């Protein structure tokens, strides 16, 4: 009887998929090559890139909600939505004299599950079957002791093999009794007590990739358990499952519905390795981020199913129009700190050697930030974190790109001469530029502003080197940079206003962000006439206060809690964690 009921559920899910307007792969092919389910927080700048499968097609948009406009030159819907709610608008594609229209669903809410990509640690690369209560607690301790949480690293996630050999007699999922002798509730409570989020792993099949029990057919009983354990993120793999895209959608939708019914607010992280193009349907299936490739390995060039950094660039470079707030393309785990000591991360890269070079680790990190990919560290927490690696993890101005409230993935600008150039729009109006030298020798890169739609060749820009955290000379029309082999340079550009200082005042003594008598106090001496963008968020990225000001002292009332305060001015962003 249960089997028949489950089949009925699957059929109903398939019908719901059709009603959502997500056509199966073989019927009603879309004329669009971009997201049609998009999200924003109220009062935060929004951007939706509109792209057609035929790049020469004419595009237009109608029915936009208040606060949004259509920028035909850049082919983006942009603006600031003011009120929460569900809205729709139409995209019209005209080619060869024929026009087709497609609906966009636009959800505006201050309670989105994943407004900015998560930053944390995932157990698989270094730990695999050894994941345990002690290791999870050790990671939480390490992140707080080294002040990594101040930079945004605030999630500890268990991958495969946390499971007992079998479920309880009543079907409930159980953790391994030796490695988690007290169950998972105390583990979750410990992580939460450190001001961090707790994540777990499952599979949309009967068995996980490592052979533990999966969630297929038991979605609700598992979701209820995750709610009891206060799990914030569930990574859901797709091993041992049918290959069809329609089936994947149905199975992930079943898990998303179960998580919603369980009531804790657990976020679904889809992991089917990009084989069924989840960026085209993951949001409709209830996912908030999705892997776009096979597992990343600790090497520059991968082999077989192993992704090196070159393969990550290949897989991410053409899907930026499918990303935005609450819907992120995930480039997989970061290898910073591994140095060839990982387990699966060293496979398919020859199984030998020291891993990547420090320039290559920095390149991987910079690109993940330009792409606003979720960032899951994967080093062994039981080993000493090298100073160079810790410096990467505390590169606050680079991280600010990843955590930008508009959630945009950088667009590919050029791959000429083995120099891979990306450009990224930021919420405060700045534009970030990166160049990765994939050749074997040093090169000079030239950014041509006429190729970057967010820049104006007639305007002058304040330029900041984000790795060096230094202001450079102003730029107009072009920007040149020397780039070592396999290195990545990252710059942030802000339009220069007449009479405004070029040097960022956030670098000088006197700047401070602190809690005082129940108020947040931001002191910015020497910034008269300079425009500052201030965003106050909780640790998950929900915007609690937002303002643009030319004032030098700002006070805000906030309830008790942990917050990140991001202050942007003259191409520099400073993040401060405060406890009220």
What are these regions (language model features)?
Residues 125, 137-139, 143-245:
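Aromatic-lined carbohydrate-binding/catalytic grooves of carbohydrate-active enzymes
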